[in-house]
A protein has these predicted regions:
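P-loop NTP-binding cores centered on the Walker
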Residues: 13, 37-38, 69
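Conserved C-terminal guanine-recognition region of P-loop GTPase G domains, centered on the G4
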Residues: 54-56, 61, 65-158
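Switch I (effector-binding) loop of TRAFAC-class P-loop GTPase G-domains
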Residues: 1-32, 45-47
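Conserved beta-strand elements of beta-rich interaction domains across eukaryotes
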Residues: 41-43, 70, 122-124, 171-172
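Active-site-proximal beta-strand elements of phosphoester/diester hydrolases
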Residues: 32-42, 166
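Conserved catalytic network of the ASCE P-loop NTPase/AAA+ motor domain
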Residues: 7-8, 26-30, 43, 53-59, ...
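Conserved GTPase G-domain signal focused on the G5
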Residues: 168-185
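Extended charged low-complexity segments that act as oligomerization/scaffolding linkers
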Residues: 113, 159-168
Length: 185
């Protein structure tokens, strides 16, 4: 299966060793931006690693990529669990284990500046009718986002702006444009 996996480290307390952050340059209609990203993967065992990494690196923009698995199989709640964990941790100001002293200090008031929610595999789930709505800026009306409404309302209450968009990473459709538009929030 082509999902992200990380090796464990440590003798007594096993912790996942995260990949190094990488710099990428994205371009869209004359705009350029360098982003520093780290692909942590969506497995439930990596959720606390997300939070630790966000706080340690003082991440300003959180990009969450979901797909349409929950539309195909209603029992698959991986995407909802991941976003729910992130929103609840930000709302409760949860401090994950393994933070440095500086990270614990930063965690007291940490909140990202924005969240970008990208629905991947648009080539599989987006119909021509919803493509027209996407062009008009109403992509959030698609049923793929219905299961995330509660978390999006919570983020709104926490004053964290959210940009919702559709992408197809397989074909490179709207990936860089969606990120650039998300950074403009």
């Amino acid at each position: 299966e082509d999902r992200t996996h990380h090796p464990k480290t440590g003798l007594f307390i096993e912790k996942y060793r995260l990949p190094k952050a990488t710099s990428k340059r994205i371009k869209s209609t004359g705009l350029e931006k360098t982003i520093i990203s780290r692909d942590l993967g969506g497995h439930i065992e990596y959720h606390s690693s997300w939070l630790r990494d966000m706080i340690e690196r003082n991440v300003g923009t959180v990009v969450v990529v979901v797909d349409h698995r929950h539309l195909i199989d209603s029992k698959n709640v991986d995407n909802q669990t991941a976003l729910g964990y992130l929103v609840n941790a930000l709302g409760r100001r949860t401090k994950p284990k393994g933070l440095s002293l500086r990270g614990r200090w930063r965690a007291r008031k940490y909140s990202p500046k924005r969240l970008i929610l990208l629905a991947n595999k648009a080539d599989e789930w987006m119909t021509p009718e919803y493509y027209v709505e996407w062009e008009q800026g109403f992509v959030a009306r698609h049923p793929i986002f219905d299961v995330f409404r509660e978390e999006l309302y919570k983020l709104h209450e926490m004053h964290i702006p959210v940009r919702i968009d559709a992408i197809s990473a397989r074909y490179g459709w709207n990936v860089e444009d969606a990120l650039i538009r998300g950074f403009e929030l």
